[in-house]
């Protein structure tokens, strides 16, 4: 059905009005010009979980990261269909601390809670794993700030 619609569009686009206003259709394309279904997104190599984690930890551990890069990284990370590993969140929180960006720390923790969705055991696990970092950096969780009740 889609192939027929695409062929109709191609014929309509290549039709021209002749000198007397008559429409002349384009020549019928041969089998070599047939529309092929190609999955262009599946040709790349897949990234392992360890490589993914290392890439993001390295990104957030850059000593010269600025506020824009931090927010861009957080926004990109949140768009993935996963809950980031605690070591990635740890690196992001440390980058926030280097930039003195407390609002982003709260945003990261809220995003982790949101990404956990209905799986209520994930967020407490992440907070438990991050507790030493949170204490070291002086970061309060959204629950400690009372933001979960707003």
From Swiss-Prot:
Subunit structure comment from the entry: Component of the cytochrome c oxidase (complex IV, CIV), a multisubunit enzyme composed of 14 subunits. The complex is composed of a catalytic core of 3 subunits MT-CO1, MT-CO2 and MT-CO3, encoded in the mitochondrial DNA, and 11 supernumerary subunits COX4I, COX5A, COX5B, COX6A, COX6B, COX6C, COX7A, COX7B, COX7C, COX8 and NDUFA4, which are encoded in the nuclear genome.
Keyword presence, GTP-binding: no
Modification sites for Phosphothreonine: 141
Main location as per UniProt: mitochondrion
Record membrane topology: Peripheral membrane protein
Signal sequence extent: none
Keywords: Acetylation, Heme, Iron, Membrane, Metal-binding, Mitochondrion, Mitochondrion inner membrane, Phosphoprotein, Transit peptide, Ubl conjugation
Stored SUPFAM superfamilies: Cytochrome c oxidase subunit E (SSF48479)
Domain of life, source organism: Eukaryota
Pathway: Energy metabolism; oxidative phosphorylation
Gene3D superfamilies noted in UniProt: Cytochrome c oxidase, subunit Va/VI
Protein function: Component of the cytochrome c oxidase, the last enzyme in the mitochondrial electron transport chain which drives oxidative phosphorylation. The respiratory chain contains 3 multisubunit complexes succinate dehydrogenase (complex II, CII), ubiquinol-cytochrome c oxidoreductase (cytochrome b-c1 complex, complex III, CIII) and cytochrome c oxidase (complex IV, CIV), that cooperate to transfer electrons derived from NADH and succinate to molecular oxygen, creating an electrochemical gradient over the inner membrane that drives transmembrane transport and the ATP synthase.
A Gene Ontology cellular-component term: mitochondrial inner membrane
Name of this protein: Cytochrome c oxidase subunit 5A, mitochondrial
Modified residues (N6-acetyllysine): 87, 113
Motif SIFI-degron, residue range(s) on this chain: 2-17
A molecular function GO annotation: metal ion binding
UniProt-listed Pfam families: COX5A (PF02284)
Gene from which this protein is expressed: COX5A
